[in-house]
Amino acid sequence: MAGQVVQYGRHRKRRNYARISEVLELPNLIEIQTKSYDWFLKEGLLEMFRDISPIEDFTGNLSLEFVDYRLGEPKYDLEESKNRDATYAAPLRVKVRLIIKETGEVKEQEVFMGDFPLMTDTGTFVINGAERVIVSQLVRSPSVYFNEKIDKNGRENYDATIIPNRGAWLEYETDAKDVVYVRIDRTRKLPLTVLLRALGFSTDQEIVDLLGDSEYLRNTLEKDGTENTEQALLEIYERLRPGEPPTVENAKSLLYSRFFDPKRYDLASVGRYKANKKLHLKHRLFNQKLAEPIVNSETGEIVVDEGTVLDRRKLDEIMDVLETNANSEVFELEGSVIDEPVEIQSIKVYVPNDEEGRTTTVIGNALPDSEVKCITPADIVASMSYFFNLLNGIGYTDDIDHLGNRRLRSVGELLQNQFRIGLSRMERVVRERMSIQDTDSITPQQLINIRPVIASIKEFFGSSQLSQFMDQANPLAELTHKRRLSALGPGGLTRERAQMEVRDVHYSHYGRMCPIETPEGPNIGLINSLSSYARVNEFGFIETPYRKVDLDTNSITDQIDYLTADEEDSYVVAQANSRLDENGRFLDDEVVCRFRGNNTVMAKEKMDYMDVSPKQVVSAATACIPFLENDDSNRALMGANMQRQAVPLMNPEAPFVGTGMEHVAARDSGAAITAKHRGRVEHVESNEILVRRLVEENGTEHEGELDRYPLAKFKRSNSGTCYNQRPIVSIGDVVEYNEILADGPSMELGEMALGRNVVVGFMTWDGYNYEDAVIMSERLVKDDVYTSIHIEEYESEARDTKLGPEEITRDIPNVSESALKNLDDRGIVYVGAEVKDGDILVGKVTPKGVTELTAEERLLHAIFGEKAREVRDTSLRVPHGAGGIVLDVKVFNREEGDDTLSPGVNQLVRVYIVQKRKIHVGDKMCGRHGNKGVISKIVPEEDMPYLPDGRPIDIMLNPLGVPSRMNIGQVLELHLGMAAKNLGIHVASPVFDGANDDDVWSTIEEAGMARDGKTVLYDGRTGEPFDNRISVGVMYMLKLAHMVDDKLHARSTGPYSLVTQQPLGGKAQFGGQRFGEMEVWALEAYGAAYTLQEILTYKSDDTVGRVKTYESIVKGENISRPSVPESFRVLMKELQSLGLDVKVMDEHDNEIEMADVDDEDAAERKVDLQQKSAPESQKETTD
């Protein structure tokens, strides 16, 4: 027997075919969210308050400091927040200190700074009652970038950019005459030496001594019209502020504020880390030949002689000396923007491949401290030196798509940036108030206006592109949404601008971003998913784990290192499936490995690291596809994406053929209930589980406190599916930390169960499975195999209007008693009622304007002393195509002190309607390999082809769907699934390390089946065997969220667009079907003139004709001739508005009067076809 039995959770054993042992547990899959938010609460907020403190007034007398903060208890708990449509948030209280310097008085106060949304344990936020996810954003990291470009004459040129986290950009470039220019903040360019002079290197000689003589520098100095620091400063000021009178002081303060003011310019810790890495000597001298010795600055001894070529080993030896600033020089810069001395390191090296033996200077930035978040003059000089070195062939250009140059902004940082915006707006208000208020009676509370802070947080959660309504179709969709990485959003790319290179798979994605899971369509490659083992480091770079190789013994150690993409570029990494002996040594002399972008074979001695697992390349969703290695990547992409659209079924079932990821994905998704502590189950019922903690002290175990776990029962998920949790533990069970206590939707016994295992045959049947269509047995309908539960929410609110309050009541004008049969005495539908479209759910009347009374009404009024109530019916009705059973009704009243109602609303009623949807013709089904299709026919069980033992098969798929799509994984799954079913076992075939052909065939033989996996099938209609043996097996098939019930739509009359008077489009607007250009051609080709005329007039925008036609149909008369369509009139008006004289003539050249039909004409005919005229903005967009 191939494979070994592995336990997944408490309830499931699987036969696992993996050959590579797991050396590292999968991390918690949503820690990217939870860790980042924890960092924000612990450090991020504090950092913000530190940055902004102190706020001083213009005279410097008052100073306001933020000392400390704390989060209080949330007003509503999680469940209550969801029920009340509230935000799950805790009050943020900040300790503020006000110092009055004149008197030395200090006032301290705790100030409330708004409610701060809290993250749930499962990595989501509840905002206005709905669960939302903050997606992590992939952005370009702040750093110094150099890139190569070819100009129009085919010459190689370079440009450089210093990109901060916030602040002005600094760019260097060369032109056709080999002059080097600088641009400050995207303005006009200046010769580079102007900026150097402004920094205090004032004479030509100083500049040449600093950067080393080169042709480019000489050309630039010739072009430079300034001669000293003052002139350079004025020149820069004129460029940045044209039209303003330049003075040296103004120029200095402008340059200071652009680059050296920490409030305006911020490299962030990540920018400082990247700049030091790029500009320091230790990374730039690799493989260079020294033109001067390297001297230890402390002892004065020569560490490396002139003429030495520095290879990796040599560099490692002198690393400490380089870091203690060998060959460093300190410049005292006169008249510069910054008064402090500038320290730089410079070493002369020989220009590579130069016959004349010229030298060039390599200047490093002398490693400013990581606390220095601004750019320093040393950074600017070192970046210029790097640029000149590049022109001499020393150094590397950067690849912007490399993950070493792209970083993640997760929840914490995104929130911090948003909070910073709010605080800086608040800072302005505080300053203004300081100058107005009386200093004696002033308190911190009076100075602080928290509105801008609250507004910026609200804006972020409510309307940011990265704050998204959680995709809750099933647990996998939830999990993937939390692990999504988006390159879109504020400060990121836009769809239109994103080039092919940004979207493409890059070698640095290996183990960090999934190369498979990305949307099809305009966002392809811009939205990605985090790989299964990846994690994010403190700087926001994605790291992936590798097993360290001991270089002395050449064996794999137990040490696991997490490497970022640019660290990995220095190492050779062996694949996870390299053969090892029991001591961890490589068995083969030549090992398949990766070095940067190359997959190659190298000697085993060259290996530095080894992959942790074969599935570290792919994301959680992709890792759920068995036999992924046998599928074409395009289909695997569809498979990974479609699993997220699977609808939770009423009776879910875990796959016979899994990958072992099902348990982990279910546990971490947040849909299951997991134990927070080790304990013993004391009580289990359908809606709650009680667990007594077991605490270990001094080696003995004793009972601790009791934990309550409430279960969600038949709730509506964000996607309108049924969210239900079922306990899977029993009283007395001892559960471990993080063990699953209750299954969520689409789960069975602690494993993800998105679909069902069904018996599938690859065969055609009367052409019904043409073009990927699916033929299904009626058994699957009858036995509720693919039945799902859907819950819709409808709400109605009674508001105050100008004419009086709306009222929720059973007393509705002009409605029969039968229409009110489901309403209780309040006028609200009762729970359990069965409703269909058009039925009233909530009776509501709205006051109408008072009209002139008729004689009869006046008489009634005189007799009974009351005016007949003037109200119109605005009841909430079931929309078209909906209906079902009323599951729940929630009523919120203002009288009962419900402060969550929005202003002007007196009463709010929410009605939940549940539908049980069996599977239909027209529903979309798919497997896990991107094999999707629509059900074309549901065949009675007795007519389905049956196996030799008489069992009819469940589904027939077209064999032509396999070869051209190249997703052979489905065929292997089919065979292995049949064997697993016959053996009564579940199997796991992990990605890239699963069952191979031999394993599949041997398992098939073990199950007593024919080795080719084929069988004789008999036609259910005739009882005859089919001509050839057919592949029949068990495949895991899912029902997708694209259901025909949601798409079916019909209209006779309905709303029309306001200007063109054509019917609206789309089901949501109750629109019509657009009869477009090509359809018109079809009728023209047939010569169907009258049909065409009626489609373009009565059925579209002939306003008079359609009213008359409706009348004629009702009265049974002949239909009159059509009149002029409204869109023709719109065209005429359009031309007339351009000043053209447009008239319509008949065949006798008589002008035809184009009378406007107004609403009164239509009203006379007593037929209002325009049930509601929609604004022009809703005009049809569908074709």
Curated annotation (Swiss-Prot):
EC numbers, comma separated: 2.7.7.6
Superkingdom per UniProt: Bacteria
Signal peptide: none
InterPro entries from the UniProt entry: DNA-dir_RNA_pol_bsu_external_1, DNA-dir_RNA_pol_su2, DNA-dir_RNAP_su2_dom, DNA-dir_RNAP_su2_hyb_sf, RNA_pol_bsu_bac, RNA_pol_bsu_CS, RNA_pol_bsu_protrusion, RNA_pol_Rpb2_2
Region named Disordered: 1151-1183
Known role: DNA-dependent RNA polymerase catalyzes the transcription of DNA into RNA using the four ribonucleoside triphosphates as substrates.
Quaternary structure and interacting proteins, as annotated: The RNAP catalytic core consists of 2 alpha, 1 beta, 1 beta' and 1 omega subunit. When a sigma factor is associated with the core the holoenzyme is formed, which can initiate transcription.
Protein name, UniProt field: DNA-directed RNA polymerase subunit beta
UniProt organism field: Staphylococcus epidermidis (strain ATCC 35984 / DSM 28319 / BCRC 17069 / CCUG 31568 / BM 3577 / RP62A)
